[in-house]
Design a protein with these regions (language model features):
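Outer-membrane beta-barrel porins/channels
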Residues: 30-40, 44-45, 115-496
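N-terminal secretory signal peptides that target proteins for export/translocation
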Residues: 1-13
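Outer-membrane beta-barrel translocator/receptor signature
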Residues: 55-63, 69-161, 197-198
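Outer-membrane beta-barrel biogenesis signature
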Residues: 28-73, 266-267
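Bacterial N-terminal signal peptides
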Residues: 14-26
Length: 496
């Protein structure tokens, strides 16, 4: 399980510089399972994120803190670039549709594009044959931005309806149209979410026997979030002024990571690592959009197996469970009928700058969230070493958390892919330093669902109030979302 990294005395300056660079460049990851990175460093990524049972370099301690004692003193720095392209095609509302809560202008929208840096760093000190300690920092997240288009709100109701700039109506009324009730957001028209999570961890590993080690890590987490283009939904939030377009907001918190690494037989090893839910402070600027105000980082459980079928060859298989469903803003699903009956219609009929709180509105206890569920990710990797060069390949699947029926969530953040194919190689230099390279491709994934809010039937609620019946039917407009990503990572491991 060990890669020997020649040891020298620790050097504090490179560590500090790497940490500063990491914090300066931290941006969301793209080839991800939900918002979780599939692996840390080019060696793990070349295996599609498998490696809970392997201590290949210091990045192993970011997944499994028990790995540190199997490594010599050393450091690793990784820098990747991502080229994501996310698109959503929106169809027209059916010809027989007379009313709708919100429908998006038909067309093709590019929601994610660009080149993004993805840095990480890890450090390990081997104190003795039985103990090791170190630290590391990494980032992940979610980013989406959709420009152009318009949205119709309360379509078909004379005096109520409005058509606004922006795919969710966050901008001003379209030229030549009226907005008597002020439903348009009159703010940023582009629709987007930008969430970055940075984890700083310090680990301690202890070898119980020659073949068994355990580890623990304290984890500090910082988050940065921005929401744009949701101004039309401010009227349907419990805190309208804290719904959208308020710049970046920050939160922080922490938790614990535990790990075990066991060589159960010659050529066979197993590993397991658990990270607790990382509790976070509230995003005060976006309490009107985020259920409960805070966005905790979901707990994860990783279990891995590695087998050495022949000298220099390894086969790895990992399982990863991510409990997104336990985090209320992620796990809360959009209930279209309840949102219509208990939020949209009451707020539409009774306009107020200081509305009373309604549980079904944005930010409420029963308000809409991302509609994500728990995921189980399967990772398979193969590694072959020939002299100073090591080749890797991997494939992972099963990491899409978005539940069926969460159409608007997919439009807001379609950057979800659950299949990753990877290739990697390493070159050990004469100095003992190692260069790792990984190419990650998130295979294009397409989802097709209907916008149940785009077609509605007028009805009467209890008390003879106006109401809508919203459910999926052929008159609803269709949303087809797709995402594809290429990432290139280069890691450098050395003995400071």
């Amino acid at each position: 399980m060990t890669r020997d990294l020649p040891g020298r005395s620790p050097a504090a300056a490179p560590v500090a510089m790497s940490a500063v660079l990491m914090l300066a460049l931290a941006t969301p990851g793209w080839a991800a399972n939900g918002i979780n990175a599939p692996g840390y460093g080019a060696a793990q990524l070349g295996l599609a994120g498998a490696g809970t049972a392997m201590a290949e370099n210091t990045f192993a301690s970011l997944r499994n803190p028990a790995a540190g004692v199997w490594l010599e003193s050393g450091a690793s720095f990784d820098l990747g670039i991502a080229l994501p392209v996310g698109e959503t095609s929106v169809g027209a509302v059916g010809p027989n549709s007379r009313f709708g809560l919100i429908d998006v202008e038909p067309g093709r929208y590019t929601s994610v594009s660009g080149v993004f840096p993805l840095p990480s760093y890890a450090r390990n000190w081997r104190h003795s044959d039985r103990t090791a300690f170190g630290w590391g920092i990494t980032a992940s997240g979610l980013k989406s931005m959709t420009k152009g288009g318009s949205a119709a709100l309360a379509r078909g109701l004379p005096g109520f309806d409005a058509r606004c700039e922006g795919s969710f109506g966050g901008g001003a009324p379209l030229s030549g149209t009226s907005d008597l009730l002020g439903l348009c957001g009159n703010g940023d028209a582009p629709l987007g979410v930008d969430l970055t999570q940075v984890l700083l961890s310090g680990h301690y590993a202890y070898r119980i026997t020659d073949s068994l080690s355990v580890g623990v890590a304290a984890v500090l987490a910082a988050q940065r979030a921005l929401l744009r283009g949701l101004g039309a939904f401010a009227a349907f939030s419990n805190e309208p002024a804290r719904t959208t377009d308020n710049g970046f907001d920050f939160s922080h918190g922490g938790g614990l990571r535990l790990g075990v690494l066991w060589e159960i037989a010659d050529g066979v090893g197993v590993g397991a690592a658990w990270q607790s839910r990382l509790r976070q402070t509230e995003f005060d600027r976006y309490r009107g959009s985020i259920v409960g105000g805070s966005l905790d980082i979901a707990s994860t459980l990783n279990v891995g197996l590695q087998v050495h079928p022949a000298e220099g060859h390894r086969v790895l298989f990992d399982l990863e469970r991510i409990a997104f469903g336990d985090v209320k803003p992620f796990g809360s699903q959009v209930d279209p009928q309840r949102f219509s009956d208990e939020c949209f219609i009451p707020r539409l009929l009774i306009r107020s700058d200081n509305p009373s709180e309604l549980p079904a509105c944005l930010g409420g206890d029963a308000g809409p969230g991302f509609g994500w569920g728990d995921v189980m990710v399967y990772k398979l990797g193969y590694q072959a070493r020939f002299g100073t060069v090591t080749w890797r390949a991997g494939f992972s699947w099963g990491g899409n958390p978005v539940n069926d029926g969460q159409t608007l969530t997919r439009f807001l953040a379609p950057a979800i892919s659950d299949r990753h194919a990877t290739l990697g190689l390493s070159w050990r230099r004469s100095s003992g330093a190692v260069v790792d390279v990984a190419l990650v491709h998130a295979l294009e994934q397409r989802t097709r669902e209907r916008n149940v809010f785009s077609n509605a039937q007028l009805s009467l609620l209890d008390g003879a109030l106006l109401g809508y019946r919203v459910d999926s039917d052929p008159q609803d407009q269709a949303f087809e979302s797709s995402m594809r990503v290429w990432e290139l990572h280069v890691s450098y491991s050395w003995a400071p």
